[in-house]
């Protein structure tokens, strides 16, 4: 369970959901535990004590001295950056002594390897990316279930991977398929994780303070791929395509791509627009086609020896219940992952039609007087808001702002200029947003509260428009979390609905 170590003494840093899961897992397998948290009484301390775990707790600032006294393994919670001023010296001290630093994902990978020695061989699907992870993870899990598999969905989406694994072991019900949502934080401290199929949905600026820069952030995303992992790549994203294996390499892992254009290579996925209908399609070698397919528009001169490609229609994009072109891309990614582990197409396509989406992710919560009110509070970075605007593809009054996390807001300018009737600015980094959008020609208005922004947006919106809460920022400057921000938005929309003589 712990590599070449038998019941090591483990230092667990941070007692959030993941840290608690690691501590319980290690205790379950006979490890001695030292648990440290910068909070003197972290909320999960009582839960760990109640679990009957024997451990030493150290509260307060982290110190390199925490690795003294026989520590053999350091477990790092995903919320803690190893570059942080209070943590970097401790991590350096551990590495100087040859003490491994693992996150929960590495513990999970080691656990699967140990279970594999006894014959357990599940398929593992992993999803990462700046945006769209939760939607794609939930959808991939549903697709695998519809194909008749026993499925466990865990990771960044919650519950913690080790908690889900413990539950499955105790119930003697280990799943056939693991579907994992993974953040860059979780991947950064993984070393042997090697899923059967994995995707990077997109890579745009986010969490630069945690990683120390964009290159390190992108590199962490790339750790989702093992040596033989089938790589499901977004061909519309140049940063993602940097992880495409060299075509000439004889031992290169298999890769398939998805995108919002027509696919041009056998096994790739995309969109075909024909007679006013957008179709989800798969590119197939015409010699292997088993169903009527549309000819590809790819010109023969684009490759020296191009295959004879046809496009197999899977389903109309409008048959998806999740809105926006970005969600069509997420659906293609989920479908590609399920196909990559050998699942049959028919039940997967039924699952695509069934999935209704996740809360706070481009969720239409009301339509009042012809105006859609859209909750995208989970849009906590610039890339998410760009995707929401381009995906909805309708005139919008945008509500944006909050804690910008050091992002560059310039990429918002083009979609705002194209789609927005006006932008309502809120939160700490409203001035930075105003500066980035100043040359768009779109009216900008500052508001002290989200409620005021919603009311002003409603007054400006015309029938056919959307009032879109997609902040491009974190929420903690004004709210407890993004869900609280969404609740405030919904409450403000409910007030407007009541004034119009209706309810949500």
Curated annotation (Swiss-Prot):
InterPro entries: Mur-like_cat_sf, Mur_ligase_C, Mur_ligase_C_dom_sf, Mur_ligase_cen, MurD. It is found in: Cytoplasm. Coiled coil: none annotated. It is an enzyme of class 6 (ligase). Pfam families: Mur_ligase_C, Mur_ligase_M, MurD-like_N. Pathway: Cell wall biogenesis; peptidoglycan biosynthesis. One of its GO terms (cellular component) is cytoplasm. ATP binds at residues 129-135. Gene3D superfamilies: Mur ligase, C-terminal domain, Mur-like, catalytic domain, NAD(P)-binding Rossmann-like Domain. One of its GO terms (biological process) is peptidoglycan biosynthetic process. It catalyses: UDP-N-acetyl-alpha-D-muramoyl-L-alanine + D-glutamate + ATP = UDP-N-acetyl-alpha-D-muramoyl-L-alanyl-D-glutamate + ADP + phosphate + H(+). Its EC number is 6.3.2.9. Keywords: ATP-binding, Cell cycle, Cell division, Cell shape, Cell wall biogenesis/degradation, Cytoplasm, Ligase, Nucleotide-binding, Peptidoglycan synthesis. One of its GO terms (molecular function) is UDP-N-acetylmuramoylalanine-D-glutamate ligase activity. It comes from the Bacteria. Belongs to the MurCDEF family. Cell wall formation. Catalyzes the addition of glutamate to the nucleotide precursor UDP-N-acetylmuramoyl-L-alanine (UMA). This is UDP-N-acetylmuramoylalanine--D-glutamate ligase.
């Amino acid at each position: 369970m712990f590599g070449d170590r038998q019941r090591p003494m483990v230092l667990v840093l941070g007692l959030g959901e993941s840290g608690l899961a690691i501590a319980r897992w290690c205790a379950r397998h006979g490890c001695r535990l030292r648990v440290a948290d910068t909070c003197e009484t972290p909320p999960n301390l009582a839960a760990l004590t109640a679990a009957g775990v024997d451990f030493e707790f150290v509260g307060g600032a982290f110190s390199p001295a925490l690795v003294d006294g026989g520590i053999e393994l350091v477990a790092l919670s995903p919320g803690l950056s190893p570059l942080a001023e209070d943590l970097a010296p401790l991590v350096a001290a551990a590495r100087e002594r040859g003490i491994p630093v693992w996150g929960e994902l590495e513990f999970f990978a080691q656990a699967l390897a140990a279970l594999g020695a006894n014959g357990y061989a599940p398929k593992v699907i992993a999803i990462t990316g700046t945006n769209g992870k939760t939607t794609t993870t939930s959808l991939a899990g549903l697709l695998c279930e519809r194909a008749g598999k026993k499925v466990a969905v865990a990771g960044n989406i919650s519950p913690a991977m080790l908690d889900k694994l413990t539950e499955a072991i105790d119930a003697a019900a280990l799943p056939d398929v693991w579907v994992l949502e993974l953040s860059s934080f979780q991947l950064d401290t993984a070393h042997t994780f090697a899923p059967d199929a994995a995707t990077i949905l997109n890579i745009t600026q986010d969490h630069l303070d945690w990683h120390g820069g964009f290159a390190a952030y992108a590199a962490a995303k790339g750790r989702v791929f093992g040596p033989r992992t089938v790589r499901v790549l977004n061909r519309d994203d140049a940063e993602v395509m940097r992880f495409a294996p060299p075509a000439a390499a004889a031992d290169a892992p298999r890769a398939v791509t998805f995108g919002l254009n027509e696919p041009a290579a056998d096994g790739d996925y995309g969109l075909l627009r024909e007679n006013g209908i957008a179709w989800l399609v798969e590119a197939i070698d015409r010699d292997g086609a088993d169903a009527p397919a549309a000819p590809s528009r790819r010109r023969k001169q684009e490759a020296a020896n191009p295959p004879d490609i046809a496009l197999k229609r899977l389903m109309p994009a409008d048959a998806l219940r999740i809105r926006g072109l970005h969600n069509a891309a997420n659906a293609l990614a989920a479908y590609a992952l399920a196909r990559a582990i050998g699942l049959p197409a028919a039940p997967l396509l039924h699952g695509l039609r069934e999935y209704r989406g996740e809360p706070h992710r481009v969720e239409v919560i009301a339509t009042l007087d012809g105006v859609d009110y859209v909750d995208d509070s989970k849009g906590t970075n610039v890339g998410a808001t760009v995707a929401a605007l381009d995906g909805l593809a309708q005139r919008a009054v945008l509500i944006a702002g909050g804690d910008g996390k050091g992002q560059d807001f310039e990429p918002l300018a083009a979609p705002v200029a194209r789609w927005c009737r006006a932008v309502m600015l809120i939160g700490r980094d409203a001035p930075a947003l105003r500066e980035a959008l100043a040359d768009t020609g779109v009216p900008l208005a500052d508001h002290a509260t989200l409620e005021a922004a919603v009311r002003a947006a409603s007054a400006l919106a015309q029938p056919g428009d959307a009032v879109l809460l997609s902040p491009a920022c974190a929420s903690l400057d004004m709210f407890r979390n993004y869900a609280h921000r969404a609740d405030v938005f919904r409450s403000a929309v409910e007030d407007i609905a009541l004034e119009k003589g209706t309810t949500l």
